[in-house]
């Protein structure tokens, strides 16, 4: 309730941030994530990096997470299944799937039915922007350098 009220009040600021997020390069995203891993002394392994997606495992020997940043308008069930199978193949039990666009309804349905098998957190562009700490401050400029993925590790 509070979250939807916040989104309603700050819709213009969120839309500006979302437009800027859609323009970010995968190279910049990878730099931010890797720098945060180094600062937090976390092990990481880049699995895939191309113009549209960045896939990385982050964590320690005991607890690992698979993080996907996907620049696409809509994530399909095929993309989700690929991510889910990669988690199972690598024995990772926590996944974070971030997209600059939205998830198709099939993906949400599959996540709901698979939640006991895989723990995958889905974040569309709007949810990701709202979770950023700087968006909650007044008169704060939107900057790529202020993006943070630390809370997802």
Predicted stretch roles:
Residues 1-153:
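Mixed-charge (Asp/Glu-Lys/Arg
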């Amino acid at each position: 309730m509070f979250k939807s009220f916040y989104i309603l009040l700050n819709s213009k600021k969120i839309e500006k941030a979302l437009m800027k997020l859609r323009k970010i390069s995968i190279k910049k995203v990878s730099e931010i994530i890797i720098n945060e891993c180094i600062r937090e002394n976390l092990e990481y392994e880049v699995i895939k990096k191309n113009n549209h997606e960045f896939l990385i495992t982050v964590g320690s020997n005991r607890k690992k997470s698979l993080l996907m940043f996907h620049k696409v308008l809509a994530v399909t069930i095929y993309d989700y299944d690929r991510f889910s199978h990669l988690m199972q193949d690598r024995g990772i039990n926590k996944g974070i799937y971030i997209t600059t666009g939205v998830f198709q309804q099939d993906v949400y349905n599959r996540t709901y039915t698979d939640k006991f098998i895989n723990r995958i957190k889905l974040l569309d562009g709007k949810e990701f922007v709202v979770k950023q700490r700087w968006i909650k401050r007044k008169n704060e400029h939107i900057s790529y350098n202020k993006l943070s993925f630390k809370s997802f590790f």
